[in-house]
């Protein structure tokens, strides 16, 4: 059963619309659906709400520590409420999936994502669930003939807003993720994964 849903992103209005904040977009939607208000909670270093989602009580968290220190926020809340790693779902932007794709996964490496890296270090575990929201990779924007030897600027890419057509399909993928949340919060993660990956 998932007891904590974390959205990853960077704090501040200048980052709100950037690709790196896709995790925040999902948690914002969940809070809206539940009629919950995310409030600044200093002891958890983030915006926090306790919400009732599909009949289950769930903690929602958006760390306000900047991406590479997200673990500080997650471990503060998880320790306080005695939540185990496999009861945590972290929603984050995923470079290795094209825009419009969303996947659920338990455990694994960070794939170069600094937020995941820090969470794994603070939890001393990689065995938490991830909701991977595809944003594409900057190499995909380089014409095929010019890709050899090209060094895509990943840092710049994730800190820019998606193009209009990308935003539309990312929004649609978040809607698909929201549709499986009743299963997620009840602990039916395998069923949720199958449904999500079928689309």
From Swiss-Prot:
Subunit and partners: Monomer.
Active site: 20 (proton acceptor)
Pfam families given in the database record: Pept_tRNA_hydro
UniProt: tRNA binding residues: 15, 66, 68, 114
GO molecular function, one term: tRNA binding
Role noted for this protein: Hydrolyzes ribosome-free peptidyl-tRNAs (with 1 or more amino acids incorporated), which drop off the ribosome during protein synthesis, or as a result of ribosome stalling. Catalyzes the release of premature peptidyl moieties from peptidyl-tRNA molecules trapped in stalled 50S ribosomal subunits, and thus maintains levels of free tRNAs and 50S ribosomes.
EC main group: hydrolase
Family: Belongs to the PTH family.
Record EC number: 3.1.1.29
This protein's GO CC annotations: cytoplasm
Gene source species: Burkholderia ambifaria (strain MC40-6)
Reaction catalyzed: an N-acyl-L-alpha-aminoacyl-tRNA + H2O = an N-acyl-L-amino acid + a tRNA + H(+)
Record protein name field: Peptidyl-tRNA hydrolase
Subcellular location: Cytoplasm
């Amino acid at each position: 059963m998932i007891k904590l849903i974390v959205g990853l992103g960077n704090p501040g209005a200048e980052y709100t619309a950037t690709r790196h904040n896709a995790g925040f977009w999902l948690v914002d939607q969940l809070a809206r659906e539940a009629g919950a208000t995310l409030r600044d909670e200093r002891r958890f270093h983030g915006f926090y709400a306790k919400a009732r989602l599909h009949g289950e009580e769930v903690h929602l968290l958006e760390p306000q520590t900047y991406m590479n220190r997200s673990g500080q926020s997650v471990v503060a809340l998880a320790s306080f409420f005695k939540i185990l790693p496999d009861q945590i779902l972290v929603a984050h932007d995923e470079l290795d999936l094209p825009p419009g794709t969303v996947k659920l996964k338990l455990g694994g490496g960070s794939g170069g994502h600094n937020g995941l890296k820090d969470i794994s270090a603070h939890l001393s575990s990689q065995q938490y669930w991830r909701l991977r929201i595809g944003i594409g990779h900057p190499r995909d924007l380089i014409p095929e003939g010019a890709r050899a030897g090209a060094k895509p600027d990943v840092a710049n890419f994730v800190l820019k807003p998606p193009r209009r057509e990308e935003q539309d399909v990312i929004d649609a993928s978040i809607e698909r993720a929201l549709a499986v949340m009743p299963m997620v919060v009840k602990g039916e993660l395998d069923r949720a994964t199958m449904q999500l990956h079928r689309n």
